[in-house]
């Protein structure tokens, strides 16, 4: 059973409740709806690996990851959600509707959403949809750090603070592994937020110079940034190991949580821009309500594309979801064959946010496609951890391929797309977007439905790759290349990136992955 839904007239059944407070809260919601005569839904999340490990949405957001190492999940397809009604609303109201449905026990979601985004984005629409040739590009990078992560990480700090208050928790320590964009977006969202501390780990030499500069110059009294000798998978595995090692440990009243998309509070806000893009196409007269739209998503940790699948299960008429990968093509092989195998070379590419071999959010998809078979998911995850690979059943592969397409693109292919889009459409994109555009061309979705390519970062976050694609070569530092790219194309350098030059480096720590637990404990315990 994917999630527990409580409606008027139904008997209360809540497995695995561990606290009286949680039980009373469940009873309260049921009794209140009977007294008011209104029909409502109260949702409980549980681990992808054990449905007995349950949590209210606030607790799921606060903990970030389930006690057994699984991810908190419910089936959004079980929600009673008015998806057509929300299409008529402005972006802020739409976000409040969607987050209120996925995280129903948060108080005043409308106020929380509006406070989270106030003054942070270039426009109130947050994520403009731009026609480019015969396709559309959904620009997700107009927030404070010029990356799509801003959409979710503007909201997550307020969700965590609200959850801590409602749950009566102490200080929250946010642990985050980043392949580039999540780190700065999380730091920007959490810096100097009362009752929180944040620690960001990134692979040394595994992010772009601009991404690194964004992180190591971060100000704030509650922030720590540390490089790991290894790749992103090492950093992400290290964070998960810290969670496991700290289970049941006295942390002086602190609670560990995550800003990665393993946290449902990070994933849920990403669902919103799929609805926003669809609504924009309806308002532009490109489609009528009920007609399908295809989405092509540059994919690493599988959170962004999973948000699109959540939107589909909530009722949005999503057609195909195309998973675009770079040379680290583990997901392309998985969707094509049903075999997930991380035992392969790791490539550092011009699209570093996709340089991942272990896609954590795929676990939630496996849960949904297996119809909530926690034992099956737990077995696959154990095999992946033990042997480095697994193969799904023919039935699950059939379900996977009924929803997803895939394609991959190497650095040379991405550079060719960047050059061609500029020459033919006068549109400038970053390497991640170029990978997705290439995937859209390879899959050839030719049924007449609109194709939306998600653009996840400003081209100015990767000036060397973009300038190299346009001119065939480049030299100088990143900031000189930004200026050169500006002069060449006439496009504007985002102020948050231009302002990095000359800022003081505040974080210089570099450690081995085996040192992460001691590093975290020293910070948390104050030693």
What are these regions (language model features)?
Residues 6, 18-21:
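Intrinsic disorder/low-complexity segments
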């Amino acid at each position: 059973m994917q999630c527990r839904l409580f409606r008027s007239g139904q008997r209360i059944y809540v497995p695995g409740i561990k606290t009286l407070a949680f039980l009373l809260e469940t009873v309260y919601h049921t009794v209140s709806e009977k007294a008011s005569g209104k029909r409502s839904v109260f949702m409980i999340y549980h681990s992808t690996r054990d449905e007995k490990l349950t949590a209210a949405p606030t607790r799921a957001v606060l903990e970030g990851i389930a006690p057994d190492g699984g991810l908190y999940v419910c089936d959004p397809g079980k929600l009673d959600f008015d998806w057509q009604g929300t299409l008529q609303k402005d972006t802020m109201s739409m976000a409040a509707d969607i987050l209120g449905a996925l995280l129903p026990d948060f108080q005043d979601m409308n106020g929380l959403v509006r406070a989270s985004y106030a003054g942070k984005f270039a426009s109130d629409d947050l994520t403009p949809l731009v026609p480019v040739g015969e396709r559309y590009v959904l620009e997700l990078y107009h927030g404070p750090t010029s990356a799509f992560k801003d959409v979710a990480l503007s909201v997550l700090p307020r969700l965590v603070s609200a959850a801590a208050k409602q749950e009566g928790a102490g200080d929250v320590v946010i642990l985050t592994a980043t392949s580039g964009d999540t780190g700065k977006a999380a730091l920007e969202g959490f810096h100097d937020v009362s009752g929180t501390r944040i620690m960001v780990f990134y692979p040394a030499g595994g992010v772009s110079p601009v991404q690194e500069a964004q992180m190591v110059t971060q100000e704030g009294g509650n922030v720590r940034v540390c490089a790991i000798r290894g790749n992103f998978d090492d950093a992400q595995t290290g964070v998960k190991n810290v969670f496991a090692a700290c289970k049941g440990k006295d942390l002086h009243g602190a609670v560990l949580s995550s800003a990665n998309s393993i946290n449902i509070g990070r994933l849920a806000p990403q669902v919103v821009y799929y609805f926003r893009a669809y609504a924009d196409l309806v308002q532009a007269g490109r489609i009528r309500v009920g007609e399908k739209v295809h989405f092509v998503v540059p994919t690493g940790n599988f959170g962004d594309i999973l948000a699109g699948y959540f939107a589909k299960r909530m009722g949005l008429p999503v057609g195909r979801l195309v998973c675009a990968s770079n040379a680290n093509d583990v997901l392309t092989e998985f969707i094509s064959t049903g075999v997930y195998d991380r035992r392969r070379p790791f490539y550092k590419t011009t699209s570093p946010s996709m340089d991942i071999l272990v896609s954590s959010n795929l676990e939630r998809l496996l849960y949904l496609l297996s119809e909530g078979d926690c034992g099956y998911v737990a077995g696959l995850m154990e095999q992946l951890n033990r042997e480095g690979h697994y193969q799904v059943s023919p039935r699950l592969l059939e379900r996977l391929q009924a929803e997803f397409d895939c394609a991959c693109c190497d650095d040379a292919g991405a550079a060719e797309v960047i050059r061609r889009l500029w020459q033919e459409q006068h549109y400038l994109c970053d390497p991640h977007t170029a990978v997705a555009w290439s995937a859209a061309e390879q899959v050839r979705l030719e049924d007449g439905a609109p194709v939306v390519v998600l653009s996840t970062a400003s081209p100015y976050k990767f000036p060397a790759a973009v300038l190299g694609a346009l001119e065939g070569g480049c030299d100088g530092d990143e900031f000189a290349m930004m200026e050169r790219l500006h002069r060449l194309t006439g496009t504007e350098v985002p102020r948050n990136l231009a302002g990095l030059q000359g800022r003081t480096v505040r974080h210089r720590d570099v450690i081995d992955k085996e040192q992460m637990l001691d590093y975290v404990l020293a910070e948390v315990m104050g030693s």
